[in-house]
């Protein structure tokens, strides 16, 4: 009937984030692709990019699904960083196959979360520490944390229906979506 690509969150893995929902989706007739994002679970890698590089990985998985299961509609489902990742995938030029996105507790940008956590933990050293982390990301990973913006990505493509689940202030820093 349909294929759902399930994308877990930061420092998690597919079996932790989807142990409850995967059996339900399968029972409802969905074929599932449960992946471990880079630097998580059984996947390799040494740098998490908060959805920036992971988006490209999911696009490759989407291409694989389109080759191996032609004609079946595809849905993307992500939790936390996985939600941000699938929302950025939805912002890419449409393949015509993505029929919908489920985003559970995604963020509009990781920058306020990271800055807020560092400031709360390190006080006045929070801002310089963030700058050092971002510099490390640019040098080692070829990306800046400011590139991760699911909110901006969605402005590129608004034709795909999205279902958002989110609490009120868990992520902090004002980075929850304004749905």
Protein language model regions, located:
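Short beta-strand element of the alpha/beta-hydrolase
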Residues: 2-9
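Alpha/beta-hydrolase active-site loop
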Residues: 48-69
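Short beta-strand/loop motif that positions the catalytic acidic residue
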Residues: 157-158, 163-166
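Conserved alpha/beta-hydrolase "acid-adjacent" motif
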Residues: 171-178
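Alpha/beta-hydrolase fold nucleophile elbow
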Residues: 69-80
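The serine-hydrolase catalytic nucleophile loop
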Residues: 10-24, 37
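Conserved alpha/beta-hydrolase
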Residues: 24-44
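Hydrolase active-site cap/lid region
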Residues: 88-146, 155
């Amino acid at each position: 009937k349909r294929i759902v690509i399930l994308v877990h969150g930061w420092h998690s893995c597919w079996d932790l984030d989807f142990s409850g929902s995967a059996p339900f989706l399968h029972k409802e007739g969905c074929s599932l692709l449960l992946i471990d994002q880079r630097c998580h679970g059984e996947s390799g890698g040494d740098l998490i990019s908060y959805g920036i590089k992971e988006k490209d990985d999911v696009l490759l998985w989407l291409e694989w699904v389109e080759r191996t299961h032609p004609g079946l509609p595809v849905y993307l489902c992500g939790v936390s960083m996985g939600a941000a990742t699938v929302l950025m995938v939805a912002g890419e030029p449409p393949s015509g196959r993505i029929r919908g996105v489920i985003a559970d507790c995604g963020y509009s940008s990781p920058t306020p979360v990271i800055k807020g956590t560092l400031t709360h933990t390190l006080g006045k050293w929070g801002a310089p520490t963030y700058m050092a982390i971002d510099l490390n990301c640019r040098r080692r990973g070829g990306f800046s944390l400011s590139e991760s913006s699911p909110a901006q990505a969605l402005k590129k493509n608004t034709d795909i229906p999205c279902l958002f689940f989110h609490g009120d202030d868990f992520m902090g820093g004002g980075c929850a979506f304004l749905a």
